């Protein structure tokens, strides 16, 4: 069975490796163009391209698929049975969706229809969801509105960051899409069910500005945001006129004026919130490295009563 693979980041690269390891023929891999990255802004290949080259697969990097006759012709010439799409980042027009014999399967990191859109992992943690998961979806022209082929649940742990949930769902998604491809190969079809009309939510892209901590919120809400926005864009506060990223914190039953430092020690930097307080245990000063609060407190002291 011929499988075209389209994806860009690590989440997708894991799935590509799994599909290849399962023995499926992959005549074409699509990924986004190389982009400048890092402090040196060096042109860097996306993880899917790196994985594809290691596997000896053909890689193409079109800037767009919409209104791109050359790319469409390339896809048609492959005569693929199905396309697997994972965090590709380009819009697939209807003519692309229709090109493979069995259409396009998307690996989406939420329990649809909850958290359609760009940042499902982060929004699930931020909202305090007890669980999330992966859906393998038969793509249509809408935003994550296609019929669901399979659903795989994951219980969000109380200390899970977005990075940790991402890594768990990356492995779940890779195994899930392989299982569905194997079913398609053996049975010639997949049983997909329509998404419920109730419970639709949208996971908007994250912004740096919304990552700024609002101390008038409850400590529980802020703690979830810190985990949801870890590692990027990272929840932050202004300290000495510069943004300081907050990496880890926990809720403590203390009270004070919102944004007021209650104590600073090797055990934690405690800041009052709208309800309860937050004990910060890991942070990252502007231009510095991530550090635990003991290392931070050894070189700096924030007086009780300071406003953040």
UniProtKB/Swiss-Prot annotation:
Catalysed reaction equations from the record: L-methionyl-tRNA(fMet) + (6R)-10-formyltetrahydrofolate = N-formyl-L-methionyl-tRNA(fMet) + (6S)-5,6,7,8-tetrahydrofolate + H(+)
GO cellular component labels: cytosol
InterPro entries with a match to the protein in the record: Fmt, Formyl_trans_C, Formyl_transf_N, Formyl_transf_N_sf, Formyl_transferase-like_C_sf, GART_AS, Met-tRNA-FMT_C, Met-tRNA-FMT_N
UniProt key word Protein biosynthesis: yes
Sorted UniProt keywords: Protein biosynthesis, Transferase
Enzyme Commission code(s) on record: 2.1.2.9
A GO molecular-function descriptor: methionyl-tRNA formyltransferase activity
A Pfam short name: Formyl_trans_C
Signal peptide: none
Entries under HAMAP family matching the protein: Formyl_trans
Protein family membership: Belongs to the Fmt family.
Protein name (database record): Methionyl-tRNA formyltransferase
Annotated source species: Neisseria meningitidis serogroup A / serotype 4A (strain DSM 15465 / Z2491)
UniProt gene name: fmt
């Amino acid at each position: 069975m011929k499988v075209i693979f389209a994806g860009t980041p690590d989440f997708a690269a894991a799935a590509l490796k799994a599909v290849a390891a399962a023995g499926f023929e992959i005549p074409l891999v699509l990924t986004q163009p190389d982009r400048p990255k890092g402090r040196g802004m060096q042109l860097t290949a996306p993880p899917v391209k790196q994985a594809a080259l290691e596997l000896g697969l053909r890689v193409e990097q079109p800037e767009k698929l919409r209104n791109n006759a050359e790319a469409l012709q390339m896809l048609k010439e492959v005569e693929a049975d199905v396309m697997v799409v994972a965090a590709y980042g380009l819009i697939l027009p209807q003519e692309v969706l229709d090109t493979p014999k069995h259409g396009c399967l998307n690996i989406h990191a939420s329990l649809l229809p909850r958290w359609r859109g760009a940042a499902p992992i982060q929004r699930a943690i931020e909202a305090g969801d007890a669980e999330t998961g992966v859906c393998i979806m038969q793509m249509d022209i809408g935003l994550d509105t296609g019929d669901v082929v399979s659903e795989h649940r994951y219980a969000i742990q109380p200390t899970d960051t977005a990075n940790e949930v991402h890594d768990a769902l990356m492995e779940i998604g890779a195994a899930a899409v392989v299982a569905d491809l194997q079913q398609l190969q053996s049975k010639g079809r997949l049983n997909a069910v329509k998404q419920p009309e109730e419970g639709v939510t949208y996971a908007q892209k994250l912004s740096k500005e919304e990552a700024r901590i609002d101390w008038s919120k409850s400590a529980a809400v802020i703690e979830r945001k810190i985990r949801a926005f870890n590692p990027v864009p990272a929840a932050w506060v202004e300290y000495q006129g510069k943004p300081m990223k907050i990496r880890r914190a926990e809720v403590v039953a203390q009270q004070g004026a919102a944004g007021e430092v209650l104590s600073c020690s090797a055990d934690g930097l405690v800041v009052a919130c709208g309800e309860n307080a937050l004990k910060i245990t890991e942070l990252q000063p502007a231009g510095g490295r991530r550090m635990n609060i003991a290392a931070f407190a050894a070189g700096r002291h924030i007086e009780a009563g300071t406003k953040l």
